[in-house]
């Protein structure tokens, strides 16, 4: 996750938007203006050793990122996932300007400095027309590997208001990375607001389950059969049970959703991929292997979550034995199947 240095986007914004942000600030989708998050995160939600020795936030120093992550783990490609809130403004024109500036920032300040990195196309997802414009502007640029959306949305992503974004993704052969987070229009759970960080961290998975069900049951993958979506940082142990539950419901009530031509779990095996972070840690490590097998080894993509505090070390996160073929799929082949890597 790359971090913004103070004022880093200014050089990529027009004078109109620099003045606007200086005078009015960013109008995010929150309950209160400029409220602090609660439950509290750890500082920058990051590892203690990820703070660059030269100063700045974790993830803001390309040289230190190169040393601590890319070189340390022999990483060929690393996909940037900016969590900087530029696509969640209530002011859609502001969101479009900020997304475009953030895309320039990723390309120039990170990928141009370290060609093993690849950027994500940030889009103002509640403005499909502006999103399409940004996708078409960046899709041919080798520095961009995917389109990034957030899992907390104004409406479920399967709704047809979002379909133009999916059409543009498929037409440009770009995958979508659906990362946890997004708008904060309401409480993070159907039960209200949590009191503890441990609750809040667990609740992140719920938005992923909801979005997976929406995408499948609204018929997105029938309309866009070549669309590839990777669910990122929502965990994955829940995936088999969701598939089983949806299949059972579909068998009884399929006439309600005639747009769903196949059992829902089949779409999960053809159009969805799952990033591994955060890795679950059962007492018996082989239980996790069973989860991989239920989902399918070809669906799993390693993710580090660097520089966050729950970083998953590729050497330590998976405590069961893998064959060489399984390692290649998890750490290499599946990512090459999902993402657009061009040199």
Residue ranges and their predicted role:
Residues 1-343:
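Helix-coil boundary/capping segments in enzymes
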């Amino acid at each position: 996750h790359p971090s913004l240095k103070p004022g880093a986007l200014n050089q990529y914004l027009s004078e109109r938007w620099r003045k606007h942000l200086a005078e009015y600030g960013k109008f995010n989708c929150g309950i209160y203006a400029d409220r602090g998050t609660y439950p509290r995160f750890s500082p920058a939600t990051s590892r203690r050793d990820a703070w660059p020795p030269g100063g700045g936030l974790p993830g803001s120093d390309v040289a230190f990122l190169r040393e601590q992550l890319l070189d340390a783990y022999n990483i060929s490609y690393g996909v940037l996932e900016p969590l900087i809130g530029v696509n969640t403004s209530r002011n859609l024109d502001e969101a479009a300007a900020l997304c475009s500036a953030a895309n320039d920032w990723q390309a120039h300040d990170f990928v141009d400095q370290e060609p093993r990195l690849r950027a994500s196309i940030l889009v103002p997802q509640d403005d499909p027309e502006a999103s399409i414009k940004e996708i078409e502007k960046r899709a041919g640029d080798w520095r961009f590997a995917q389109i990034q959306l957030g899992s907390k949305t104004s409406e479920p992503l399967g709704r047809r208001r979002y379909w133009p974004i999916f059409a543009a993704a498929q037409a440009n052969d770009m995958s979508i990375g659906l990362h946890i987070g997004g708008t904060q229009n309401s409480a993070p759970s159907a039960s209200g607001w949590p009191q503890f960080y441990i609750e809040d961290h667990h609740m992140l998975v719920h938005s992923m389950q909801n979005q997976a069900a929406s995408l499948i049951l609204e018929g997105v993958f029938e309309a866009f059969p070549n669309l590839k979506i990777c669910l990122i940082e929502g965990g994955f142990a829940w995936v088999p049970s969701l598939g089983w539950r949806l299949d059972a419901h579909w068998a009884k009530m399929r006439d309600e959703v005639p747009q769903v031509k196949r059992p829902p779990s089949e779409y999960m095996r053809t159009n969805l991929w799952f990033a591994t972070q955060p890795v679950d840690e059962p007492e018996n490590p082989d239980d996790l292997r069973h989860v991989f097998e239920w989902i399918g080894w070809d669906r799993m993509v390693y993710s580090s979550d660097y520089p966050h505090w729950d970083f998953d070390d590729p050497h330590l996160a998976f405590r069961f034995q893998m064959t060489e073929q399984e390692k290649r799929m998890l750490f290499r082949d599946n990512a090459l199947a999902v993402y657009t890597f061009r040199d």
